[in-house]
């Protein structure tokens, strides 16, 4: 309670930055300065990512890591405290998924736990890290690849939700692969000599159309989305290069790979039909999450002890207005009055 104002200031400050993935420079500078002032050592640019960092304090076991995402969403600019769509800047990015809240609250938790550990001479190490470019699957796999979690005993991950709770076992969310297919053909003048060209854009369109026909045969839990990330330069030139960007989602690793292989075959087929070549580039990955029961049940007891915040009438009015605005079917009664189920 003594740090309520600090919490609100930090959450609002990160909200004001509204930085897209791999562009979280102001957020990184702001958060790491606060951690430095409170005795944490900072390593910046981890895993070769300029906006990524890791903060540490303490020594010995257990090593407890606190993580949360920090990037925002394109074209989600929004005035705070307004229930309807009202951007601060039209078309600008914004924190439409609440990624402005997690890391600030982890910082406050870490500072508080650090004080308790110092007072009671409790051994252990606290680690904080940001989920940079989470919306693009940008970093967590690379942190793991480069060994940043090798000595971690437990990782507690924070994300905004409709209630205060914790879970264990398989997560409800999917894992996925982010992959971009780039087709290379032959440029030509579209009017003067189109027969000399081999259109990479045609290959992209064929892959997109082919995947739409594939959807009927996907498992109910399989999800996929794609955009054309490069469609060529201008209409009077046969595009020599074009790209299409896919997310392939599923609950288990084998099923994610099954979707990925289907995508690869479709890309090869599109290249064959257009006499182009194709290259694939994995941009990121996130495997399905599995949460620890012992950690979850222990945290849940603490959640029951702490309880929910005391909501004001203004809090409830805004929450209900937002729920009505988005036509929510699940949450309609404003802020929760009971702690969520484990």
Positions of the model-derived regions?
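Predominant activation on well-ordered alpha-helical scaffold segments within soluble catalytic domains
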Residues: 8, 32, 107-114, 141, ...
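Structural recognition of the beta-strand scaffold that forms the well-ordered cores
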Residues: 43, 63-67, 127-130, 155-157, ...
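Histidine/acidic-residue-rich, glycine-tolerant segments that coordinate divalent metal ions
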Residues: 85-94, 100-101, 117-239, 249
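Metal-dependent amide/peptide-bond hydrolase catalytic core
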Residues: 205-342
